[in-house]
Amino acid sequence: AGDVITQVNGTEITGSSDLVSLVSEAAIGNTVTLFMAVSLGFTTVLVAAVRPLVGLIGVPAEAVPGTVQYLTICFIGIPFITAYNIISSVFRGLGDSKSPMYFIAVACAANIALDILFIGPMALGPVGAALGTTLSQTLSVIVALFGIRRHKTGLRLSRQNFRPRKGVLGRILKIGLPVAVQDGCIQVAFIIITIIANHRGLIDSAAVGIVEKIISAMFIVPSSMLATVSALSSQNLGAGKPERAAQTLKYAAMIATGYGIAVVLVIELVAEPLLGCFTTDAAVVLMGCQYIRGYIVDTIFAGIHFSFTGYFAACGKSYIGFLHNIIAIVLVRVPGSYLASRLFAGTLLPMGLAAPAGSLLSVMICVAAYRWMKRRGTLYTAA
């Protein structure tokens, strides 16, 4: 939702004398209608199908009850994730990329604090982890709502704006469908990797699960680069300043790389105590440290290809982001994780390295596509 409406609004309202046009209001209203309906539908279906899904992913028998509780709570939180993304995308589409960053910071800090509280002193286990995620998302929505009330956006949304319009929904889906399918494929890849880890036993499964929670927090900055670059680049392209859009990509990639290197260094130093915040099982901590020390390198490369994906979406070429992710998943991430799991039964480090290897391939594809289209003069062709 966030990337779709950010790009639609950014290209339509920037460069005009009136910041908010009727078209952008219709885009916002139709986005709310579309994505909230989809999120409620997904919530209903997933909560109803949670037990079959747990059986499908091969969760160890002793972990099934906790997994069912965890997923049920997380599925209930889907509408809150959607609401947060919609509100943040409105800010980005209007040129304010700082406010969503603050909302993300609140969610990140709350998630970490609540996870430590619920899983540590309160010993709630999987339920605590799920509550930490869902409550932090809810808090970010509340903060975002306060933010949008205080921010003078100039929006005048009426009931008409929320009524589905074929033309508006068509543009939203044209831009957003490749991004949505791309994200869906990434999540499917994560599920497959989780299944691979589950078949290695309870210790490895628990280690991978904890690391995924930590990685999700560490990835807030790299993943936000997609929407940020998309918003700023689309605004500059809409204002007829493609050179500034290219500079946005350049500096975003530099920031993402710097952040990734810093995170890698920190994790290398504090992996053991960090994992120890989530479990007292020495075996889980050991395997988790191996996995995260490989996986964390992905923060460097992922931030770069997220930046390129946002830039390509602003240029009306969101299909490139879809293609490079599919190629990386099919050729590297999933087969790499599977082979590492089979060939290195005593360590999770090689399995963790499959993720950054896939992202490195994505970066190579993005750079090649950028240079090729720039030479041909086709970068800024409208979608």
Segments predicted by a language model, with ranges:
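Short alpha-helical transmembrane segments in multi-pass integral membrane proteins
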Residues: A37-G77, P121-L177, S233-D298, S341-A383
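Hydrophobic/aromatic end-of-helix segments at the C-terminal termini of transmembrane alpha-helices
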Residues: V50-L53, L114, V188-G201, V229, ...
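Transmembrane helical elements of multi-pass membrane transporters/channels
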Residues: I73, A107, S136-S140, A144, ...
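Residue-level hotspots within pore-lining transmembrane alpha-helices
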Residues: G41, V45, F75, P79-F80, ...
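C-terminal recognition in membrane/secretory proteostasis and scaffolding
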Residues: A1-M36
